[in-house]
Amino acid sequence: MYVNGIELAVAEHGPADGPVVVLLHGFPELGFSWRHQVEPLAAAGYRVLVPDLRGFGGSDAPEAVEEYAIDVLARDVLGLLDYAGAEQGTLIGHDWGADLAWKTAWLYPERVRAVAGLSVPFAPRAPAPPLGLMRKHLGEDFYIVWFQEPGVAEAALERDVRRTLATARVWDAAWAEDRDAPAPTPAFLTEAELQVYVDAFTQSGFRGGLNYYRNIDRNWERTAAVAERRITQPALFLTGERDPVRGFMPAAVMDGWVTDLRVNEVIPDAGHWLQQQTPEPVNAHLLAWLELTR
C-alpha cells in the first residue's frame, strides 16, 4: 500500500464496511505480533488494518533518521485511514505502536475515534528535551540512550538475530557484552513463530526500529504547539503485571491528560509482550471497550 510517500505492507481482515481499527506494533515486532487479535476483531465486525510500520518487515525503510519522526509516522497512519476511506478510525498500539497511537490521536484528534495503548501510556510533553533527562536520571547504559549512536546498537543486535529476538532482557550496553547468556525460545512463541521474526529482521536489520528512538528529542521539538492538549477520545490502557516499563512509565503519567480513560487494567502474569503472552484477557478487554465506542 502506497501511503505518505512510501510502500507499507498491510494485512486486512474483516468486512470492508466495518468500523476501521488499525493495529500498530512495537519494536522489535511486526504486524504479525497481532496474530491473536485480528480474527476476533474481524469476527466482531471490524475492518482491521495491520501494517508493518515503516522500517519493519515488508515495508519501506527510508535512510534518513528524520523520516522516523513522530509527525511523519502519524501521517503514515492517516494514510491508512485515507486508504480505507475512513474519516475516523480506532487506533490500538503496543510499545512504540502505542506511542504512535496516542500521538496520532493527540496531533490529529479529528481523525481518531478512539485510542488504545498496550504497555506504553500516553506521556505529556517533558519540560526539557527528554534524552538529556534520561541520561541524567537513568544513565548512559539505559537502553534508549544506548540506542542513540548510529551503528552501535545495530552491530550488537544483528550479531545474532535469533538470540536478540529470543532474549527476555531489555537490551542495553550490558546486554551487548553478555554474549553467552542463554536465549531459549520464549514461552509465548512457537519455534515457527520466532522464525517469522528472525527471517524478517535478518532481512531488514534493526536500523529502522532504532531510528524511532533516535527521534525522541526531535519529536519533543515538533510537538511544542500541542504541548497542553489533552487526549479526549475514549481510551483504553492495558499493561502486564510483569512489564518492566511500569517501573519508569507508570499509568499514572496519564492522569489529567487522558480525560476519557474507560479501561485501565493490569493483566496478571503478563510481561511486556502481553497481546502475545495473554491474548484471551487482552482480546476480552479490547472487544468490550470497542463495543462501548461504536
Q: Where are the model-predicted features located?
A:
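Catalytic active-site module of serine/aspartate enzymes centered on a nucleophile-bearing elbow/loop
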Residues: 261-294
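Signature tryptophan residues that serve as conserved aromatic anchors
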Residues: 27, 31-34, 96, 102, ...
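Conserved residues in the N-terminal Rossmann fold of short-chain dehydrogenase/reductase
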Residues: 2, 12, 50, 239, ...
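Conserved HGGG/HGGXW glycine-rich cap/lid loop of the alpha/beta-hydrolase fold
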Residues: 9-60
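Active-site helix-initiating loop/hinge in glycosyltransferases
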Residues: 26, 69, 277-278
